[in-house]
């Protein structure tokens, strides 16, 4: 593994807590999880980490989860409205949003688990997800470049990434259970550390 499960959980909870404070929906916030997660990995682990986005498919204990749009020609694409983001770092695929999957889709009963796999173990196609934990990603570079460019125009994105990196501490170091931040009006707000507990790994 690139990072310990305890540190993965901490990164997920830090980002999740900031999203809740911003009233963003953590279940559809993969851009935040991937961008802030990559920033934390680069800052604290000194690894080259890149957020990627596009089509993503998972076999989660026999439950298939697909982030994609169905095209008129019958194929699926990750360049449309239904896309997903993940992190690629040192040959690993890490999805910091995986513990939020129970909230990501109504009626999806999957436990909150870590997703951290070698990229070399990725299935060869979307149709080859036979075992639990199997995954398939297809990065849509052009579509995601446009999405990220539009998204980064929001001034708070860089601030939140810095707050996330400042809040995170590698285990076994103590991490603050809450932090205080100033909102756009200069008012101080307390953000508690929040998120699902992990139930193992995919």
Model-derived regions: residue spans:
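A structural boundary/capping signal
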Residues: 1-202
């Amino acid at each position: 593994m690139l990072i310990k499960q305890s540190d993965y959980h901490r990164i997920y909870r830090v980002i999740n807590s900031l999203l809740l404070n911003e009233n963003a929906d953590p279940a559809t916030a993969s851009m935040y999880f991937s961008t802030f997660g990559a920033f934390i990995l680069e800052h604290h682990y000194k690894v080259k980490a890149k957020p990627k986005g596009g089509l993503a498919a998972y076999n989660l204990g026999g439950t298939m989860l697909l982030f994609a749009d169905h095209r008129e020609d019958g194929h699926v694409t990750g360049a449309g409205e239904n896309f997903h983001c993940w992190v690629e770092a040192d040959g690993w695929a890490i999805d910091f949003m995986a513990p939020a999957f129970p909230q990501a889709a109504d009626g999806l009963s999957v436990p909150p688990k870590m997703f951290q796999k070698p990229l070399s173990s990725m299935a060869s196609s979307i149709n080859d997800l036979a075992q639990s934990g199997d995954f398939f990603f297809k990065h849509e570079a052009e579509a995601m470049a446009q999405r990220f460019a539009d998204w980064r125009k929001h001034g708070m994105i860089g601030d939140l990434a810095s707050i996330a990196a400042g809040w995170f501490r590698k285990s076994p170091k103590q991490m603050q259970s809450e932090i205080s931040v100033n909102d756009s009006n200069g008012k101080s707000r307390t953000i508690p550390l929040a998120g699902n507990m992990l139930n193992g790994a995919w």
